[in-house]
Regions:
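Conserved beta-strand/loop scaffold segments within soluble protein domains that form the structured core
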Residues: 110-118, 126-273
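N-terminal amphipathic, basic helical "cap/leader" segment at the start of enzyme domains
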Residues: 2-148
Length: 273
């Protein structure tokens, strides 16, 4: 029998799956029901699971958070909300507000030809075969309850694509801003596809713009092709009311190189895997 923590999410999906699907892309929707069944079976990981030994996951997910299932636009000026300045680092700067790619403020400097940094659900709607090849392929929902939960609730997120042999010189910086007038749960998805010989550096910064209780789940899937090189730095500077659970999955081909670092400066509870 699912405890209260699980039950509210099972009930939520059963009552709202139509709304969730209506406001997302078919490729993301295609795996929801199976992920829901996996979550129903797995529930939240208990402390008996080695990698969750020190965190009471049920307690993190127990409070009643709001969710923006109807994709209402949340007013924010990201430039006012946050500066994530890293000295002497010149970046191409993008914003994700809660789980939605912010397309009103894009970097002035153009990326190399063919490189895409955009909304995951937008690209999934435009190129379903391409996204379908990668989405939810290495983030297995039958092995981790948190990944399953994220997969049946996530409606959007970020897609980064670097074509074959393209080297992105300038670091791509993505600032994830949590912004809400009520306590909010955010389920964000990130898909990174680096083709053969591609090279890029990413800096993801997590911030909270409001003094509210936030719960953010995030699943990152990174596919790194032969001889490709990926540097992924994740930096969190939120506040004590922030709960963050992030699972990272990386698939590497021959002679590829991945450097993944996570830095937590200020937070409430964070689980990075």
């Amino acid at each position: 029998m699912a405890m209260h923590s699980e039950k509210q999410y099972l009930d939520l999906y059963q009552s709202s799956s139509r709304i969730i699907k209506k406001n997302s892309a078919e490729v993301l929707n295609a795996v929801r029901d199976a992920a829901f069944e996996d979550f129903r079976r797995l529930g939240f990981p208990s402390r008996k699971v080695e990698r969750y030994k020190y965190t009471d996951m049920s307690a993190i997910f127990e409070p009643d958070y709001g969710l923006n299932l109807n994709r209402l636009e949340i007013p924010v000026d990201p430039y006012e909300a946050f500066r994530c300045d890293v000295p002497n680092l010149s970046t191409s700067l993008y914003f994700v507000v809660n789980d939605a790619f912010y397309n009103k403020a894009l970097p002035k400097v153009e990326l190399p030809e063919g490189v895409i940094v955009d909304s995951l659900s937008k690209i999934a709607a435009e190129s379903p075969e391409f996204i379908g090849k990668y989405y939810a392929k290495i983030a297995k929902t039958d092995e981790d309850g948190i990944t399953a939960l994220n997969t049946f609730l996530a409606q959007d997120g970020l897609l980064i694509y670097v074509p074959k042999n393209v080297k992105v010189e300038r670091t791509i910086q993505v600032i994830n801003i949590l912004r809400s007038d009520v306590d909010l749960m955010v389920n964000r998805r990130v898909l990174i596809v680096m083709e053969q010989g591609a090279e890029a550096k990413f800096l993801f910064c997590d911030h909270a713009a409001d003094d509210k209780n936030f719960l953010a789940t995030q699943v990152i899937e990174a596919f790194v092709g032969e001889n490709a090189s990926l540097d992924l730095y994740c930096l969190e500077e939120t506040h004590y009311k922030n709960r963050r659970v992030s699972n990272v999955y990386i698939e590497q081909q021959a002679n590829s190189r991945v450097n993944h670092n996570v830095i937590t400066l200020h937070n409430g509870i964070t689980r990075n895997r």
